[in-house]
Amino acid sequence: MISEVLDDIIDKNRNLTVDEAYECMDDLVSGNYPNVVVSSFLTALRMKGETIDEITGLTRSMKNHAVQIDYKPEDYLIETCGTGGDTFKTFNVSTVASIIASAGGAKISKHGNRSVSSKFGGADALEALGVNIELSPEKVINSIDKCNFAFIFAPIYHVATKNVMMIRKQLKTRTVFNLLGPISCPTNVNARLTGIYDPELLETIAKVAMNLGVECGMIVHGFDENGNPAMDEISNIGKTKVAFIDNGDITVKYITPEDFGLSFSKPEDIVAPETPQEHIQIIYNILNNVTTTSQDRARLDLCLMNSASILYLTKKVDSLEEGVIYSRKLIEDGSAKKQLEKIIKYSNE
């Protein structure tokens, strides 16, 4: 299919149908095309601008080629992740938020790889904490059932795209795979909290997510204190643009820390630390409710906002503000800290 459509994409800016995009991904993972053709296809799509149908078709094929995890949630199974590629580097916010929210009953399938834009990614952090990130499908299901959380290490499950990943690294520029990774989780997620590096793409990814079976979700991009695009997650230093998904409807609006019952923080208080050891200490401080400095409080607030969003999307609370109150309680009574211990235990069974 790639050989049939490549000229039209380049010469005519032609958009692909869902089926054509699906077949193109089949071609990409087949290994039958020279690297230069694959590079040309990915670059041509990037220059044209990837459409909802194209991202949908590519993702469906990518998920079909992945190692399957046959987990059928009774209510909501949420994926929490971001694209990376943002400009403002924070600590492992989604990782900590997932630990807290799973302690509150949210079932979470966290799908990811090692660091993309951060200095120390979610997979790196979980591994350093003692979590086994290389789980088989059976162990993923067991971990979700036992402690509401499992990490799905992308390279194990998306083996078919290995050759394409090598080409991506050689290109050293964004491709459609920066968007496919966070939305191609092999579990049957029906809820989603996903950070995107470009605020202009939120509605596009929200529509793709609905095409993939997501019933409720928040596709987000956080801004800095000056209103500049900054981070692929909810922000507590500025406003956050959100595409809310609610059973077939999409609503795009801006939210602020005040919607969570919190105040704005200073950028310097949430910026990523320099070393892995500092990242891990931040996680421990949050789970132990350390609030000594302004940095401690700002980092805690950021995690509370993200945890609150997960709890809200999975219907464990009725509002974002209630989600913050519940998340704070889970930390203060030790539930979140015990949850990390459970995640470590069941991931290593």
From Swiss-Prot:
Residues the record lists as binding 5-phospho-alpha-D-ribose 1-diphosphate: 82, 85-86, 90, 92-95, 110-118, 122
Residues binding Mg(2+) 2: 232-233
Record-linked InterPro entries: Anthranilate_Pribosyl_Tfrase, Glycosyl_Trfase_fam3, Glycosyl_Trfase_fam3_N_dom, Glycosyl_Trfase_fam3_N_dom_sf, Nuc_phospho_transferase
Function: Catalyzes the transfer of the phosphoribosyl group of 5-phosphorylribose-1-pyrophosphate (PRPP) to anthranilate to yield N-(5'-phosphoribosyl)-anthranilate (PRA).
GO process annotations (BP): L-tryptophan biosynthetic process
GO terms for MF: anthranilate phosphoribosyltransferase activity; magnesium ion binding
Gene3D superfamilies: Nucleoside phosphorylase/phosphoribosyltransferase catalytic domain, Transferase, Pyrimidine Nucleoside Phosphorylase, Chain C
Organism: Methanosphaera stadtmanae (strain ATCC 43021 / DSM 3091 / JCM 11832 / MCB-3)
Residues binding anthranilate 2: 168
Quaternary state and interactors: Homodimer.
GO cellular component, one term: cytosol
Cofactor mode of binding and number, as noted: Binds 2 magnesium ions per monomer.
The family this protein is said to belong to: Belongs to the anthranilate phosphoribosyltransferase family.
Catalytic reactions on record: N-(5-phospho-beta-D-ribosyl)anthranilate + diphosphate = 5-phospho-alpha-D-ribose 1-diphosphate + anthranilate
Gene name tied to this protein: trpD
Name of protein: Anthranilate phosphoribosyltransferase
Alphabetical UniProt keywords: Amino-acid biosynthesis, Aromatic amino acid biosynthesis, Glycosyltransferase, Magnesium, Metal-binding, Transferase, Tryptophan biosynthesis
Chain residues that bind Mg(2+) 1: 94, 233
E.C. designation(s): 2.4.2.18
Annotated residues for binding of anthranilate 1: 82, 113
Domain of life: Archaea
Names of the cofactor(s): Mg(2+)
Involved pathway(s): Amino-acid biosynthesis; L-tryptophan biosynthesis; L-tryptophan from chorismate: step 2/5
